Amino acid sequence: MKSAVIQLPGLNRDRDMIAALTKISGQAPVTVWQTETELPEVDLIVIPGGFSYGDYLRCGAIAARMPVMKAVAEKAAKGVLVIGVCNGFQILLEAGLLPGALMRNASLKFVCREVKLQVANANTAFTRAYAPGQIIRCPVAHHDGNFFAAPETLARIEGEGQVAFRYAEGTNPNGSINDIAGIVNGAGNVLGLMPHPENLVEAAHGGTDGRALFESVLGRAA
C-alpha cells in the first residue's frame, strides 16, 4: 500500500502516523509539505493530528486553505482514500470534504484519555476489518471535538450510513451529537475521526484495536 502523510506547521502526530503506516503496510509513507500542489500516486492520504497554525481563527481553518489541500481534494474526487485524524478531521471539515462542524468540547476543557468506540458501519473502506457493532478502545486528545451538524445534514449523515464510529458505553468525551466520533463522505472514500487509531496498533503500546482500520485500507489497496 502506497500512502502519503500531509505535513503542516503545528501538526505533531505525523511521526506516530508514519510509524503506524510503516508497521502495518511494510512500506514507509511519503511526506508531503503544505506548499505542494501535486500529490504522488498513492492509495491513501492521511492528514494527522496536532494544532495546525496554532488553531488560530478556527481549528483547521488556515490549514484547509493551503495549496496541498486543493491537491487532496482533487485526489479525493478521483476516489483515492483520505483519512483525517483529530486536527486532520477538522481540516477536512473546513475544506468542505466532509459535512458538519467540530466545536469546543462541552466541558470547555482539553480531554486526553481512552474512550470506547462502536463500529457504526462496518461496510466502509476503513472499517471492513471490524465486525458490525464491535466495541474497540481508542485514545482521544482534543479541545474541539464536539461534532455538530444542522438537522437536515445530520439526517442525511445518519440516513446514508455515513457514521463510521460512535462513542460507546457512556464515554463520549466532548458532547458530540448522536455520540458521533467519525464519519465518511457520501462517496465513502474520505474518513474523519477525532480518536487516534494510530496509537493502538501494537501490543507493546497498550493494544491493537486501531490496527483493523489500517488493515481495512490495506485490504482494499491489495
UniProtKB/Swiss-Prot annotation:
Top-rank lineage group of the source organism: Bacteria
EC number assigned by the record: 6.3.5.3, 3.5.1.2
Recorded catalytic activity of this chain's protein: N(2)-formyl-N(1)-(5-phospho-beta-D-ribosyl)glycinamide + L-glutamine + ATP + H2O = 2-formamido-N(1)-(5-O-phospho-beta-D-ribosyl)acetamidine + L-glutamate + ADP + phosphate + H(+); L-glutamine + H2O = L-glutamate + NH4(+)
Ligase as UniProt keyword: yes
GO CC field: cytoplasm
Sorted UniProt keywords: ATP-binding, Cytoplasm, Glutamine amidotransferase, Hydrolase, Ligase, Nucleotide-binding, Purine biosynthesis
Compartment(s) of residence: Cytoplasm
Any one GO molecular-function label of the UniProt entry: glutaminase activity
Keyword ATP-binding: yes
GO annotation terms (biological process): 'de novo' IMP biosynthetic process
Residue ranges of domain Glutamine amidotransferase type-1 in the record: 3-222
Active site location: C86, H196, E198
Pathway where it operates: Purine metabolism; IMP biosynthesis via de novo pathway; 5-amino-1-(5-phospho-D-ribosyl)imidazole from N(2)-formyl-N(1)-(5-phospho-D-ribosyl)glycinamide: step 1/2
A Pfam family assignment: GATase_5
PROSITE patterns found in the cross-reference section: GATASE_TYPE_1
InterPro entries according to UniProt: Class_I_gatase-like (IPR029062), PRibForGlyAmidine_synth_PurQ (IPR010075)
Subunit-structure text: Part of the FGAM synthase complex composed of 1 PurL, 1 PurQ and 2 PurS subunits.
Role played: Part of the phosphoribosylformylglycinamidine synthase complex involved in the purines biosynthetic pathway. Catalyzes the ATP-dependent conversion of formylglycinamide ribonucleotide (FGAR) and glutamine to yield formylglycinamidine ribonucleotide (FGAM) and glutamate. The FGAM synthase complex is composed of three subunits. PurQ produces an ammonia molecule by converting glutamine to glutamate. PurL transfers the ammonia molecule to FGAR to form FGAM in an ATP-dependent manner.
HAMAP family from the UniProt entry: PurQ (MF_00421)
Protein name: Phosphoribosylformylglycinamidine synthase subunit PurQ
Source organism of the structure: Chelativorans sp. (strain BNC1)
Name of the encoding gene: purQ
